[in-house]
Amino acid sequence: MTPIGVFDSGYGGLTVLDSIRSRLPEYDYLYLGDNARAPYGGRSFEVVYEFTRQAVMKLFSMGCQLVILGCNTASAKALRTIQQHDLPLLETNSTDNCKLSIVNCKLPRRVLGIIRPTAEIIGYKTQSRHVGLLATEGTVRSESYKLEIQKLFPDITLTSVACPLWAPLVEAGEATSPGADYFVKKRIDQLLSEDPKIDAVILGCTHYPLLLPKIKSYIPENVEVISQGCHVAESLENYLQRHPEIESQCSKNGQTRYFTTENPDKFQENARIFLNETVAVQHVSL
């Protein structure tokens, strides 16, 4: 069995997984949440890289050949180093990988992020060429969205606002509570006051789709709100079509397994918020 791996520091990656499964239901998936060490947003580049590298290697050891970083912070702070440093080392040391019990050790391995797929579509979502980004502090500080968008659409002006309390609100089950309105409105007002010309807003954290009803209630109707999940799923589908050597190795039984570094019962309870279903969860150590 060669599932597609999806990793997040917390629960937000479940929204990405849900979108991917809706578009590509035939594949097998393995979700890993490093919930015991979440959140990653305020951690340094070095720590996020090391934690993400550990998770990716764990997913490889569990049979994954392709891993999606369903976490903006990990995509911003760790993806490039893993792609440019760790993956080439794996390919040049395939014999050592077999000794380390990495399943299907001689197959090529790939790790993809979720920032690039979002940046690729933003130019087609704005008329004013003024775009807003709502994200965690770590993602905003990394300037990853700014760099990707400038490469693809240099005429776009990006204004970014950090929303440090939004993800904790979601994980606390408060996404629909009246108390969340204050924090949502505060950041949206800040964003639109910094650039009133914005006509498209990126939700740069995979937790934020659960706040979408509140977000839309405070954003003008002419401003398009862009969630990542469907665009990541479409990008993955295109990637698999372009890379038959990867796609042909992916198992197709329509099964999903869930793993967490924290208490499985707690994960199961919180996963219900994101997936609206009860899932079986196993504990894993990194």
What are these regions (language model features)?
Residues 1-286:
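Non-catalytic structural scaffold of enzyme domains
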